[in-house]
A protein has these predicted regions:
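N-terminal extension/subdomain marker
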Residues: 1-192, 200, 223-226, 390-404, ...
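Short beta-strand segments
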Residues: 162, 238-239, 275, 385-387
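Glycine-rich phosphate-binding "P-loop"
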Residues: 189-211, 335-338
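Active-site beta-strand/loop microenvironment that shapes enzyme catalytic pockets
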Residues: 215-259
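Metal-assisted phosphate- and nucleotidyl-transfer catalytic regions
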Residues: 222-225, 311-326, 362-365, 378-381
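C-terminal amphipathic alpha-helical segment
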Residues: 276-343
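Charged substrate- and nucleic-acid-binding regions of tRNA-handling and nucleotidyl-transfer enzymes
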Residues: 345-427
Length: 427
């Protein structure tokens, strides 16, 4: 691997790009989107038809628990082998790709495609790895995904890693330099996904990326941004696709068990293709995810809340404050002197405990203030509207608390998620 990147866990990769006359039919949205909308995936099938497509190389998770999943996986693996044998792909050796993704709202998100060393990724809460999960990893979700990946010849990435680069030193300088790069693709994305353009970095640009990435994890940078010069540096936080990255890690760990240690470094499966995005990219938006409780007695909940957090009170004030709606209790609940970094964390710990003691109470995770207020105001329900987590809170919270509470925030609309376009051999 390129020694210039040794301190970063992020490397140039041998990236495969399709050579097809119908490029618009190749990219397809991340497999973990539209999981309750099979109509979307049927529309994707219709859009692709018989043309070569990444749709033939991934398993939409809407089908993950279906009765024919084993047959689907066999078909995917056969399609990978056929595309490789037919010479469908062009290989870009030891490359990084700069991309500009025009989202459905017209804003442009900037990214960098390369691979990460899975030895430097750990989803365990409290890990000191360079690459960490932002939310808890549900271990039960990994084995079904391992079945999809373990015999696959290729990987196609929908993992998005975030860097905390407020000075915009790593990716943004590339925006004005595309004229000296090799243009790779320029295509619309099916079913309202916007548009994407990609360019191959020059050698000197890769050197600069290596240097600026390394600088982000220096003790000086850690002290300046977080006041944590002695903390284990966090360079990449997983924004999207954590269970996909955890699956890649599990497959690599399984291979290590049957491979001599001296060969681990040469295993293609040791690395995973990802897109890196700056947390401070203007097109990257965080939206809060609210909570609505069903079949709940609001007065009992408030009594339990006060018992759980002595000193909690209605109305605003110092500490963590959440808006409550429903059952004539509209207003604010405040917890002074909270231990968690985020209001979401303070509330979630309580809700988890309360729901264990009251199994009849159900919690749903709701996008949008108006929807949460409408649902929370129905009889028997209670809504909690939570404040938006600032981007600047993400990295310090992961470093201090290990992971964020589940369903803390969402990053954009489903159709603005990564589309599969690039590929890489993992066998």
């Amino acid at each position: 691997m390129d020694q210039r990147f040794e301190q970063t866990a992020f490397y140039p990769a041998d990236i495969l790009l399709p050579q097809t006359a119908e490029m618009k039919k190749w990219p397809v949205v991340a497999c973990d989107q539209f999981t309750s909308q099979p109509d979307y995936w049927q529309a994707a099938e219709a859009a692709v038809g018989e043309a070569p497509s990444a749709l033939r190389l991934v398993l939409p998770e809407v089908y993950l628990n279906g009765p024919d999943v084993d047959k689907r996986i066999e078909t995917i693996n056969a399609s990978m082998d056929r595309y490789l044998a037919d010479g469908l792909f062009r290989t870009l050796p030891d490359s990084l790709i700069y991309l500009e993704r025009t989202q459905s709202d017209g804003r442009v998100r900037h990214g960098l495609i390369g691979c990460v060393d899975l030895e430097q990724y750990d989803f365990t809460p409290g890990s000191g790895a360079l690459i960490r999960a932002t939310e808890g990893t549900v271990l039960e979700r990994i084995p079904p995904r391992v079945r999809v990946r373990e015999h696959a010849a290729l990987e196609l990435p929908h993992v998005m890693l975030l860097i905390d680069d407020p000075q915009r030193s790593v990716i943004e300088p590339l925006t004005g330099e595309t004229g000296v790069m090799e243009a790779l693709y320029d295509t619309d994305l099916m079913l309202g996904g916007g548009h994407v353009k990609g360019w191959r970095l020059t050698d000197s640009q890769m050197s600069r990326v290596a240097n600026t990435l390394s600088a982000l994890k220096s003790p000086e940078a850690m002290a300046d941004k977080y006041g944590m010069a002695d903390a284990a540096p966090l360079l990449f936080a997983v924004g999207d696709g954590n269970h996909s990255l955890a699956t890649a890690k599990a497959c690599y760990e399984n291979l290590k068990k049957v491979t001599p240690p001296e060969r681990w470094a040469s295993l293609p499966a040791r690395y995973a293709l990802v897109e890196v995005v700056n947390l401070h990219d203007d097109a990257l938006t965080f939206e809060p995810i609210h909570r609505v409780l069903f079949h709940v007695d609001g007065r009992d909940l408030w009594d339990a809340f006060q018992a759980f957090y002595p000193g909690a009170h209605t109305g605003g004030g110092e500490g963590h404050t959440a808006e409550v709606c429903g059952q004539g209790m509209d207003g604010l609940w405040t917890v002074p002197h909270p231990k968690a970094q985020l209001t979401m964390g303070t509330l979630q710990v309580f809700l988890d405990a309360y729901c264990r003691d009251h199994p009849e109470v159900q919690v749903d995770y709701i996008h949008g203030d108006d929807v949460a207020r409408k649902l929370g105001s129905r009889p028997g329900n209670l809504g909690f509207l939570l404040p938006l987590m600032g981007k600047e809170q993400l990295f310090p919270t992961v470093m201090a608390d290990g992971v964020l509470p589940r369903k803390t925030f969402s990053m954009g609309e489903a159709r603005d998620k990564r589309y599969y376009l690039e590929a890489r051999r993992i066998r």
